[in-house]
Curated annotation (Swiss-Prot):
Name used for this protein in its record: Methylglyoxal synthase
Gene3D superfamilies for this protein: Methylglyoxal synthase-like domain (3.40.50.1380)
Statement: the UniProt record of this protein carries the keyword Signal: no
Active-site residues (renumbered): D60
Biological process annotations from GO: methylglyoxal biosynthetic process
Species: Clostridium perfringens (strain 13 / Type A)
Lineage: Bacteria, Bacillati, Bacillota, Clostridia, Eubacteriales
Length: 119
């Protein structure tokens, strides 16, 4: 299974903790992430992560293309709903593609834990 991991700046620490908590399970899958999120996960765990560009530089769109090409099976996107994002259209497009292609999507830690408990 290929899992995409994305986290806004204020949610990166939550993503690191999530990756640590589920490191054994995640290590059995192919992981892809936006640039900074992937780097931070690799710096804080033993997980290997293929890094795309940073979200604002097109990383969300790269992962969206993977979703559209049936190349990603699940997306964990820890969003910061209280901070405006300059690349909000890219984020909306990614979320829409997950719905269109019926790719499981978690946008907060609690939903991510529920999904990851089942992988």
């Amino acid at each position: 299974m290929k899992i995409a991991l994305i986290a806004h700046d204020k949610k990166k620490e939550e993503m690191i903790e999530l990756a640590k908590d589920f490191e054994d399970k995640l290590s059995k899958h192919i992981l892809v992430a936006t640039g900074t999120t992937g780097l931070k996960i690799m710096q804080n765990t033993s997980l290997e992560v293929k890094r795309c560009k940073s979200g604002p530089l097109g990383g969300d769109q790269e992962i969206g293309a993977m979703v559209a090409n049936h190349d990603v099976d699940m997306v964990i996107f820890l969003r910061d709903p209280l901070t405006a994002q300059p690349h909000e259209p890219d984020i909306s497009a990614l979320l829409r593609l997950c719905d269109v292609y019926k790719v499981p999507l978690a946008t907060n830690t609690e939903s991510a834990k529920l999904i990851m408990a089942d992988i």
